[in-house]
Amino acid sequence: MSGGKYVDSEGHLYTVPIREQGNIYKPNNKAMAEEINEKQVYDAHTKEIDLVNRDPKHLNDDVVKIDFEDVIAEPEGTHSFDGIWKASFTTFTVTKYWFYRLLSALFGIPMALIWGIYFAILSFLHIWAVVPCIKSFLIEIQCISRVYSIYVHTFCDPFFEAVGKIFSNIRINMQKEI
């Protein structure tokens, strides 16, 4: 068994074992592996992150993009002194900026650790517990659904059809008396 490369949906290459008849994931891929042998191989855990655009999927556009004007506003005719307004703006902006950085420095890595563990557990449970339970339930419910279907067609359908025929001949005439 020799090593080969596997290309994921983003175009990154990963090493996979290749057998003479192809690997178990992509049969007969030895020729393909030789074609892409010269390309660079990426590890899924060392992908580059963008330090400029830190919200590429725009998760927080509406939630935390809060500026001074979004929080504090003076209506026309009710204005404080210009110096107070400028100092308030500067104080708000700088305090928000540095306090966020302080909180990020203190709690960012522990929170990332907690959320990483949480989503790892969630992924593990989904892959190894939830999906197999659902598949098992769907397989088991098929025989019950067949029995239920036979019961409904045998007993319930004739009963409700008869009741429907009984009530289908009822006519109601509404007359308004003056």
From Swiss-Prot:
<dbReference type="GO" id="GO:0051480">
    <property type="term" value="P:regulation of cytosolic calcium ion concentration"/>
</dbReference>
<feature type="cross-link" description="Glycyl lysine isopeptide (Lys-Gly) (interchain with G-Cter in ubiquitin)">
    <location>
        <position position="30"/>
    </location>
</feature>
<feature type="cross-link" description="Glycyl lysine isopeptide (Lys-Gly) (interchain with G-Cter in ubiquitin)">
    <location>
        <position position="26"/>
    </location>
</feature>
<comment type="similarity">
    <text>Belongs to the caveolin family.</text>
</comment>
<feature type="lipid moiety-binding region" description="S-palmitoyl cysteine">
    <location>
        <position position="133"/>
    </location>
</feature>
<dbReference type="GO" id="GO:0030154">
    <property type="term" value="P:cell differentiation"/>
</dbReference>
<dbReference type="GO" id="GO:0005794">
    <property type="term" value="C:Golgi apparatus"/>
</dbReference>
<feature type="region of interest" description="Interacts with SPRY1, SPRY2, SPRY3 and SPRY4">
    <location>
        <begin position="167"/>
        <end position="178"/>
    </location>
</feature>
<dbReference type="InterPro" id="IPR001612">
    <property type="entry name" value="Caveolin"/>
</dbReference>
<feature type="cross-link" description="Glycyl lysine isopeptide (Lys-Gly) (interchain with G-Cter in ubiquitin); alternate">
    <location>
        <position position="5"/>
    </location>
</feature>
<dbReference type="GO" id="GO:0019901">
    <property type="term" value="F:protein kinase binding"/>
</dbReference>
<keyword id="KW-1003">Cell membrane</keyword>
<dbReference type="GO" id="GO:0070836">
    <property type="term" value="P:caveola assembly"/>
</dbReference>
<keyword id="KW-0564">Palmitate</keyword>
<dbReference type="GO" id="GO:0045121">
    <property type="term" value="C:membrane raft"/>
</dbReference>
<dbReference type="InterPro" id="IPR018361">
    <property type="entry name" value="Caveolin_CS"/>
</dbReference>
<keyword id="KW-0333">Golgi apparatus</keyword>
<comment type="function">
    <text>May act as a scaffolding protein within caveolar membranes. Forms a stable heterooligomeric complex with CAV2 that targets to lipid rafts and drives caveolae formation. Mediates the recruitment of CAVIN proteins (CAVIN1/2/3/4) to the caveolae. Interacts directly with G-protein alpha subunits and can functionally regulate their activity. Involved in the costimulatory signal essential for T-cell receptor (TCR)-mediated T-cell activation. Its binding to DPP4 induces T-cell proliferation and NF-kappa-B activation in a T-cell receptor/CD3-dependent manner.</text>
</comment>
<dbReference type="GO" id="GO:0031410">
    <property type="term" value="C:cytoplasmic vesicle"/>
</dbReference>
<dbReference type="GO" id="GO:0060090">
    <property type="term" value="F:molecular adaptor activity"/>
</dbReference>
<feature type="modified residue" description="Phosphoserine">
    <location>
        <position position="2"/>
    </location>
</feature>
<keyword id="KW-0472">Membrane</keyword>
<keyword id="KW-0832">Ubl conjugation</keyword>
<feature type="region of interest" description="Required for homooligomerization">
    <location>
        <begin position="2"/>
        <end position="94"/>
    </location>
</feature>
<dbReference type="GO" id="GO:0001937">
    <property type="term" value="P:negative regulation of endothelial cell proliferation"/>
</dbReference>
<feature type="lipid moiety-binding region" description="S-palmitoyl cysteine">
    <location>
        <position position="156"/>
    </location>
</feature>
<feature type="region of interest" description="Interacts with SPRY1, SPRY2, and SPRY4">
    <location>
        <begin position="149"/>
        <end position="160"/>
    </location>
</feature>
<keyword id="KW-1017">Isopeptide bond</keyword>
<dbReference type="GO" id="GO:0005901">
    <property type="term" value="C:caveola"/>
</dbReference>
<feature type="topological domain" description="Cytoplasmic">
    <location>
        <begin position="2"/>
        <end position="104"/>
    </location>
</feature>
<comment type="subunit">
    <text>Homooligomer. Interacts with GLIPR2. Interacts with NOSTRIN. Interacts with SNAP25 and STX1A. Interacts (via the N-terminus) with DPP4; the interaction is direct. Interacts with CTNNB1, CDH1 and JUP. Interacts with PACSIN2; this interaction induces membrane tubulation. Interacts with SLC7A9. Interacts with BMX and BTK. Interacts with TGFBR1. Interacts with CAVIN3 (via leucine-zipper domain) in a cholesterol-sensitive manner. Interacts with CAVIN1. Interacts with EHD2 in a cholesterol-dependent manner.</text>
</comment>
<feature type="modified residue" description="Phosphotyrosine">
    <location>
        <position position="25"/>
    </location>
</feature>
<dbReference type="GO" id="GO:0031623">
    <property type="term" value="P:receptor internalization"/>
</dbReference>
<feature type="modified residue" description="Phosphotyrosine; by ABL1">
    <location>
        <position position="14"/>
    </location>
</feature>
<feature type="intramembrane region" description="Helical">
    <location>
        <begin position="105"/>
        <end position="125"/>
    </location>
</feature>
<dbReference type="GO" id="GO:0005768">
    <property type="term" value="C:endosome"/>
</dbReference>
<dbReference type="GO" id="GO:0031295">
    <property type="term" value="P:T cell costimulation"/>
</dbReference>
<dbReference type="GO" id="GO:0008142">
    <property type="term" value="F:oxysterol binding"/>
</dbReference>
<feature type="cross-link" description="Glycyl lysine isopeptide (Lys-Gly) (interchain with G-Cter in ubiquitin)">
    <location>
        <position position="57"/>
    </location>
</feature>
<dbReference type="GO" id="GO:0048471">
    <property type="term" value="C:perinuclear region of cytoplasm"/>
</dbReference>
<feature type="modified residue" description="N6-acetyllysine; alternate">
    <location>
        <position position="5"/>
    </location>
</feature>
<keyword id="KW-0007">Acetylation</keyword>
